[in-house]
Amino acid sequence: AMLLERSGIQFDADALHTLENAVGYSTTELQSVNLGIYAGDLSYSVIFNQNQQSVEYLNTCRRLCDGLGVGDIINADLISRADNNRDVRDSLVDIVTDTFYELNGRFRENGMEEVSGLLAAGGWIEGVYLGTRSLNSSTADLKLRIAEQKMTLDNLIGLLGSYAPTPALTNMKEALRPVEAAFAGVTITENPAVSTAAVDGTVVISGGPEVNYDEATLTAISESIAVVRNQYAQ
């Protein structure tokens, strides 16, 4: 979400997942993925200073956490603290970050790796979805950051594959295959980092990964991520 703000795009409330839909998710699979999706919308709202909306999305995350048996983490005190800090963005960022770090830790401690993996997948899907809603007006920096998500997707697929297979994890890996195919149009070449000393004595680091892509690839990424996102966010 910070990346989206720095890239200069405008907040788009219409792109967010509908709050009212949360009551319809009764399976662990849908609750887990949509918790990640709503968490992505929560972060997006916080970063763009949509204060009231941020608290509403936090409340929605609380409902899904109740269904997953971890409702004590996003409790009334946390909601109240977020509400009291709604006009202090940095405080809200800290509250959201700490909360989802604790949630992920609880899932892992309780052997709920499936939930942890689906939560991570949902959050990543929503982040890319939000970043690709306005490709025509996107900055070059945002387009580059979207293309670089190929590396994050590779890591996500590896994470999902590291858990004991379940039908829900298999469903997610299958759903992400078209997204993987779209990202195949991105090539990333690792170049060794080189340090050079400038005239004023500062050290300049050059090199690092070189990312290549074209507009057709970004369009394919945008279309494929929308399909998988809307498959779960019904």
Which role fits each region the language model picked out?
Residues 40, 59, 101, 122, ...:
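Solvent-exposed, polar/charged alpha-helical surfaces in well-ordered, non-transmembrane soluble domains
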Residues 88-173:
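Extended amphipathic alpha-helical interaction segments
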Residues 1-4, 16-23, 109, 204, ...:
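Immediate post-signal-peptide N-terminus of mature secreted/exported proteins
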